[in-house]
Design a protein with these regions (language model features):
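Conserved acidic
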Residues: 1-193
Length: 193
């Protein structure tokens, strides 16, 4: 979460990461089995947080989330809003259960590797937006509010929002491939103006 910049603003874009926590789990292979295997063979592992290391190929949750993601996309395509919402809740519950002391797989390194990575992703994204010449006025868990300090038509503002989302997505693809040798499942979307 970012501090807000109080004021009245015109032409504010909202960009939002699509299912941020599940996409972090998919991208960085965050998973209980992956944690155990990553600690056994740390030289090939993906760095997590608080000492966590995750196996690049021995895991199960990222694959389950990928399957659910595809089912959700199909539900959206078929305009099945109830099914899409149910799958979204199910995918997000994977993070919740890993952060619950009652879960047999509970390990603070799992939940921390999701939330702390999410925080870093949001901070980096805000920095990139500001480097592109726009002002970030607020951010929460997975959304960033961007002020376009100019007189624009709704169409112009929407075009900037779409372009900004494409630019950020490409930056994340490049960044994660270069830094971690991983495919990126993060996707930011222009939500509204």
């Amino acid at each position: 979460v970012m501090n807000s910049k109080p004021g009245l603003y015109k032409h504010v874009l909202v960009v939002d990461f699509k299912s941020l926590y599940p996409s972090i789990m998919r991208t960085f292979k965050i998973d209980p089995l992956g944690l155990v295997e990553g600690l056994i063979s740390p030289e090939e592992a993906i760095e997590g947080y608080r000492g966590a290391k995750f196996s690049r190929d021995k895991h199960f949750l990222p694959d389950i989330i990928t399957s659910l993601w595809q089912q959700r996309d199909a539900a959206k395509k078929n305009q099945d809003a109830a099914r899409s919402q149910a799958i979204k809740i199910l995918m997000n519950s994977f993070y919740g259960v890993l952060g619950s002391g009652g879960c047999p797989f509970y390990d603070t390194r799992l939940a921390s590797s999701i939330t702390m990575r999410g925080h870093d992703i949001m901070q980096t994204t805000a920095k990139w937006i500001e480097e592109a010449g726009y002002q970030v006025i607020y951010g929460d868990t997975d959304s960033i509010f961007v002020w376009l300090d100019a007189e624009l038509s709704n169409l112009q503002a929407s075009e900037i929002g779409e372009s900004l989302a494409c630019e950020i997505n490409q930056k994340w693809q490049d960044n994660i491939l270069q830094a971690h040798q991983l495919d990126c499942d993060l996707e930011i979307e222009f939500e509204t103006h």
